[in-house]
C-alpha cells in the first residue's frame, strides 16, 4: 500500500526527494501545494522539476481516506463518512458559518471512543483504534474541499468528533501542527480547538506543548457526583483538579477556555445547577457553551435522556450571565442527519450518499 503525503513532514519528504536526486528544498513547496489544493498535486503555477510530479503520484497515494458517504442537513451542515485504508470508518462534519463565505469543521481523533460518556452515541460503538496524524489531516483536507465546493473557506477546526483527543495526543499534536502551520495547511494556531472530557495529565501535556491553540473542556455538571454518573472520567478526576489543570493551561495561553455543558432535562439543568456552576467557575476567564442535547436513544446505562425545555435553558443561561459568566446557548447543527454533538457513530448503514 502506498503511503499518503498527509503522513509526511517536510523533513520526511525532503529525505525522499534527496534519494530521488531532487533538491530537498522542493519538499516545502510540494506540501504547501498539497494542502492548499485539498490533497491534490497539479501542474498549475510555476513549473515543477522534470518528472517530480509523476514520481510523487507513483510513489504516494493522494490519501488513504476515501469518501464513503455524504449527507446534508436542512441547516446546511454536511456530514462526511470517511473510509480509512483498513476499512474502518469515521465521521467529520462541516458547519456553515453565519458569514456566507466561512465554515467550521469538526474532526475525529479516534475510531470510536473509550470514554463511555452516558449520553453520547459514539460511546455506544466502543473504541477500535487511534487515528494517525495523516488520517486526521485527510479529514481536514476533505472538509476544506467540501467547503470550497460550496464557495466557503474552512476558517476553524475543532477536535470534537469521535474519540478523546488527549488519549491520542502525540498524533493529534502532529495533526494540529500540519493543519495550523503555514508550511502545511496554514489555518493558524488560534483557529484550532482541542476538546477533552477533562483528562488532567493530557491537559498538562497540552500545556507543555505550547502550541497557542484553544482548549475546550466537556464539564456537563457542576458537581462531582452528577458528573461521575454522566462521564466515567468524572470518577477519575475531580472538577477541582480539572480546573486546576485548566488554570495552568490558561496561565501559559492567556485566552478564555471553553466549557461545554450539555443540558439534560431533570439531570443538570436546574437554576441551582447553574448557580453551582457559576460558583465553580468563579473569576476564571471562561466561556460557557450551553449545548442542546441531541437524543441518541437509550444510553449505556439504559437511561433515555431528554433535552431541556426552552424555558429551563433560558433560565440556566440567565442565572450564569447574572453572575458574570460569559455564556452562549448554542443551537444544534445537523441533528436531522445525526451530525450534532454526541451523535457521531460512523455507521455506514445509517448514512446514504447525497449530492
Curated annotation (Swiss-Prot):
EC number, UniProt record: 2.1.1.192
Binding site for S-adenosyl-L-methionine: 163-164, 195, 218-220, 294
Family: Belongs to the radical SAM superfamily. RlmN family.
Entry protein name: Probable dual-specificity RNA methyltransferase RlmN 1
Organism field: Opitutus terrae (strain DSM 11246 / JCM 15787 / PB90-1)
NCBIfam families: rRNA_mod_RlmN (TIGR00048)
Function as written in the Swiss-Prot or TrEMBL entry: Specifically methylates position 2 of adenine 2503 in 23S rRNA and position 2 of adenine 37 in tRNAs.
Reaction catalysed by this enzyme: adenosine(2503) in 23S rRNA + 2 reduced [2Fe-2S]-[ferredoxin] + 2 S-adenosyl-L-methionine = 2-methyladenosine(2503) in 23S rRNA + 5'-deoxyadenosine + L-methionine + 2 oxidized [2Fe-2S]-[ferredoxin] + S-adenosyl-L-homocysteine; adenosine(37) in tRNA + 2 reduced [2Fe-2S]-[ferredoxin] + 2 S-adenosyl-L-methionine = 2-methyladenosine(37) in tRNA + 5'-deoxyadenosine + L-methionine + 2 oxidized [2Fe-2S]-[ferredoxin] + S-adenosyl-L-homocysteine
Iron-sulfur among keywords: yes
Gene name as annotated: rlmN1
Pfam families (alphabetical): Radical_SAM
Active site residues per record: 91, 341
Domain named Radical SAM core: residues: 99-336
GO process terms (BP): rRNA base methylation; tRNA methylation
Top EC class of this enzyme: transferase
InterPro entries documented for this protein: Aldolase_TIM, Methyltransferase_A, RNA_MTrfase_RlmN, rRNA_lsu_MTrfase_RlmN/Cfr, rSAM
Cofactor binding notes: Binds 1 [4Fe-4S] cluster. The cluster is coordinated with 3 cysteines and an exchangeable S-adenosyl-L-methionine.
Predominant localisation class: cytoplasm
Record-annotated disulphide pairs: 106-341
Keywords: 4Fe-4S, Cytoplasm, Disulfide bond, Iron, Iron-sulfur, Metal-binding, Methyltransferase, rRNA processing, S-adenosyl-L-methionine, Transferase, tRNA processing
Entry GO MF terms: 4 iron, 4 sulfur cluster binding; metal ion binding; rRNA (adenine(2503)-C2-)-methyltransferase activity; rRNA binding; tRNA (adenine(37)-C2)-methyltransferase activity; tRNA binding
Cofactor(s) needed by this chain: [4Fe-4S] cluster
GO cellular component: cytoplasm
Further details from the record: Reaction proceeds by a ping-pong mechanism involving intermediate methylation of a conserved cysteine residue.
Keyword Iron-sulfur: yes
Subcellular location: Cytoplasm
Amino-acid positions noted as binding [4Fe-4S] cluster in the UniProt annotation, renumbered to this chain: 113, 117, 120
Amino acid at each position: 500500500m502506498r503511503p499518503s503525503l498527509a503522513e509526511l513532514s517536510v523533513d520526511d519528504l525532503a529525505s525522499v526527494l534527496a534519494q530521488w536526486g531532487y533538491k530537498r528544498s522542493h519538499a516545502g513547496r510540494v506540501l504547501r501545494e498539497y494542502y492548499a489544493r485539498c490533497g491534490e498535486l497539479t501542474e498549475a503555477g510555476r513549473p515543477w522539476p522534470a518528472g517530480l510530479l509523476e514520481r510523487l503520484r507513483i510513489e504516494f497515494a493522494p490519501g488513504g481516506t476515501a469518501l464513503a458517504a455524504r449527507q446534508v442537513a436542512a441547516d446546511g451542515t454536511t456530514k462526511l463518512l470517511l473510509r480509512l485504508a483498513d476499512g474502518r470508518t469515521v465521521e467529520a462534519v462541516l458547519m456553515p458559518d453565519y458569514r456566507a463565505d466561512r465554515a467550521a469543521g469538526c474532526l475525529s481523533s479516534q475510531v470510536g471512543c473509550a470514554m463511555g460518556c452516558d449520553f453520547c452515541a459514539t460511546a455506544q460503538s466502543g473504541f477500535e483504534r487511534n487515528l494517525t496524524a495523516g488520517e486526521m489531516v485527510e479529514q481536514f483536507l476533505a472538509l476544506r474541499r467540501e467547503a470550497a465546493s460550496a464557495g466557503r473557506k474552512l476558517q476553524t477546526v475543532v477536535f470534537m468528533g469521535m474519540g478523546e483527543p488527549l488519549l491520542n495526543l502525540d498524533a493529534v499534536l502532529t495533526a494540529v501542527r500540519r493543519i495550523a502551520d503555514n508550511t502545511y495547511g496554514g489555518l493558524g494556531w488560534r483557529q484550532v480547538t482541542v476538546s477533552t472530557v477533562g483528562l488532567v495529565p493530557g491537559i498538562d501535556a497540552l500545556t507543555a506543548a505550547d502550541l497557542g491553540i484553544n482548549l475546550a473542556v466537556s464539564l456537563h455538571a457542576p458537581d462531582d457526583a452528577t458528573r461521575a454518573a454522566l462521564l466515567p472520567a468524572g470518577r477519575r478526576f475531580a472538577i477541582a483538579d480539572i480546573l486546576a489543570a485548566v488554570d495552568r493551561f490558561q496561565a501559559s495561553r492567556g485566552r478564555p477556555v471553553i466549557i461545554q455543558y450539555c443540558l439534560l432535562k431533570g439531570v443538570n439543568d436546574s437554576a441551582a445547577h447553574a448557580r453551582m456552576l457559576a460558583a465553580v467557575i468563579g473569576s476564571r476567564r471562561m466561556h460557557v457553551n450551553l449545548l442542546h442535547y441531541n437524543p441518541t436513544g437509550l444510553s449505556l446505562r439504559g437511561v433515555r435522556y431528554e433535552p431541556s425545555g426552552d424555558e429551563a435553558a433560558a433560565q440556566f443561561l440567565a442565572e450564569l450571565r447574572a453572575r458574570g459568566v460569559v455564556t452562549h446557548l448554542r443551537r444544534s447543527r445537523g441533528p436531522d442527519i445525526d451530525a450534532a454533538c454526541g451523535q457521531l457513530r460512523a455507521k455506514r448503514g445509517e448514512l446514504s450518499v447525497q449530492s
